[in-house]
């Protein structure tokens, strides 16, 4: 049986795309995934160009694959994702043993590219932007648990001064309304209970509705997804404050399947830096969104993204970021030191802040957010949380784990329940009382009496 090894860098969109690469190759050639590159007939790197380290890591990994290619000339080596889109044929020039190079919008052409490489003996490069056609050529999604990702749009049209995404994934293009609903319904029929709607900027979604001229905005899409039988929870990422509309805020009042958790990247706490980033909103406007959401959902947890050390960032600018962190009380953050990306406007800005200063700022920021995350977890001890059971605990397979609405993993034991009955709980919603908070998980006891034998604690 032929096998494919896929290494994924970067965001959840890339995770989704990697799953689709595996689906496409399985449907076309019967390839099955492997975790061992030495066993693979096809090795793919799904790349990220958001930060320089991620980009260089790709070429480092390619160097290690070179020996495998030398031992097995029939091995197919491919590079996809945003680095592929940005670098194109120069990847082959730098690593001549690479067979195929493809972008995020052309992953559906992967079998054709591999076939052309085998027939012609020449490397194949396709990093074009054929809009949204890839979704018309993808096989049905494979379900591997009660949660699933569904891409609703591609690209970004915001052109933040530091970001390469518009250049590597193209402009915003939304999937048709009915196509998204059909994919979610198909997943629900296979046992999926929670969907995460994906896009570089999901709240810019504007999907075609049938053969009409009407368009569905993101709030309407959320409303219809919530009506699909079997779907219990809806998450989404990533959203942009500039397009967080009043309709979307109101959805939190009417749509109870939207979880009490939101990832809303702010990037910085200084208006001066936000303007240099071309983010299109002020700190006050961002805080207004959070205030309105918390008026509707007082317990909603907020996660975000921060960039530290953007060109021109002063101590006063960073202090404003810390003020925002304390005021909002973030539950989590993806925080990074600014990494200049070639071809972006910010790459030309003067930057005289020492790296050591940036590193100290990042450590201070992340330590503060980590402490707040721990405080929130401790505050959950004694509460009863509704969790979606996802499968066996990673540390103890005899136990189960689930996830709370605010995205925390809860491990729990059911020692009196036979293993077969425990397995049947995967995909079910259970109430658990949180009894202990750990740095990266919670411990709970089941409190719900169920007809399938789960006892009350």
From Swiss-Prot:
Keyword Transferase carried by entry: yes
Organism of origin: Ralstonia nicotianae (strain ATCC BAA-1114 / GMI1000) (Ralstonia solanacearum)
Cellular component GO terms, alphabetical: cytosol
Keywords attached to this entry: 4Fe-4S, Cytoplasm, Iron, Iron-sulfur, Metal-binding, S-adenosyl-L-methionine, Transferase, tRNA processing
Protein name: tRNA-2-methylthio-N(6)-dimethylallyladenosine synthase
Residue stretches making up the MTTase N-terminal domain: 2-119
Stored NCBIfam families: miaB-methiolase, MiaB/RimO family radical SAM methylthiotransferase
PANTHER family the record matches: CDK5 REGULATORY SUBUNIT-ASSOCIATED PROTEIN 1, MITOCHONDRIAL TRNA METHYLTHIOTRANSFERASE CDK5RAP1
UniProt subunit comment: Monomer.
């Amino acid at each position: 049986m032929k096998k494919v090894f896929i290494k994924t860098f970067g965001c959840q969109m890339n995770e989704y795309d990697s799953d689709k690469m595996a689906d496409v190759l399985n449907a076309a050639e019967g390839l099955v995934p492997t975790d061992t590159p030495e066993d693979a007939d096809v090795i793919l790197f799904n790349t990220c160009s958001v930060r320089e380290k991620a980009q260089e890591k790709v070429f480092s990994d390619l160097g290690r694959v070179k020996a495998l290619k030398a031992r097995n000339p029939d091995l197919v080596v491919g590079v996809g994702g945003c680095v592929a889109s940005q670098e194109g044929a120069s990847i082959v020039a730098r690593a001549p043993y690479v067979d195929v190079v493809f972008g995020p919008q052309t992953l559906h052409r992967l079998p054709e590219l591999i076939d052309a490489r085998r027939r012609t003996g020449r490397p194949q490069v396709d990093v074009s932007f054929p809009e949204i056609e890839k979704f018309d050529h993808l096989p049905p999604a494979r379900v591997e648990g009660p949660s699933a990702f569904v891409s609703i749009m591609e690209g970004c049209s915001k052109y933040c001064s530091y970001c390469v995404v518009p250049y590597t994934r193209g402009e915003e293009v939304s999937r048709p309304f009915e196509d998204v609903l059909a994919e979610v319904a198909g997943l629900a029929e296979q046992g999926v209970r929670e969907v995460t709607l994906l896009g570089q900027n999901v709240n810019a979604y504007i999907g075609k509705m049938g053969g009409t001229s009407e368009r569905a905005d993101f709030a309407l899409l959320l409303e219809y997804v919530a009506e699909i039988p079997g779907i219990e929870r809806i998450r989404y990422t990533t959203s942009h404050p500039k397009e967080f509309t009043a309709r979307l805020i109101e959805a939190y009042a009417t749509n109870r399947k939207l979880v009490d958790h939101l990832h809303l990247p702010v990037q910085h706490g200084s208006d001066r830096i936000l303007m240099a980033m071309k983010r299109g909103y002020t700190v006050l406007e961002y805080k207004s969104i959070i205030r309105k959401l918390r008026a509707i959902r007082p317990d909603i947890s907020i996660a975000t993204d921060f960039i530290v050390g953007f060109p021109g960032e002063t101590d006063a600018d960073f202090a404003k970021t810390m003020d925002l962190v304390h005021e909002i009380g973030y539950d989590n953050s993806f925080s990074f030191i600014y990494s200049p990306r070639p071809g972006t406007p910010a790459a030309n800005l003067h930057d005289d802040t020492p790296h050591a200063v940036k590193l100290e700022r990042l450590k201070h920021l992340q330590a503060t957010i980590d402490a707040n995350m721990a405080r929130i977890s401790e505050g959950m001890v004694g509460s009863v949380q509704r969790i979606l059971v996802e499968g066996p605990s990673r540390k103890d397979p005899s136990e189960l784990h689930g996830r709370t609405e605010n995205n925390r993993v809860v491990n729990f034991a059911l020692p009196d329940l036979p293993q077969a009955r425990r397995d049947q709980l995967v995909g079910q919603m259970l109430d658990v009382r949180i009894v202990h908070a750990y740095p990266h998980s919670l411990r709970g006891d089941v409190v719900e009496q169920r007809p399938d034998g789960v006892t009350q604690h």
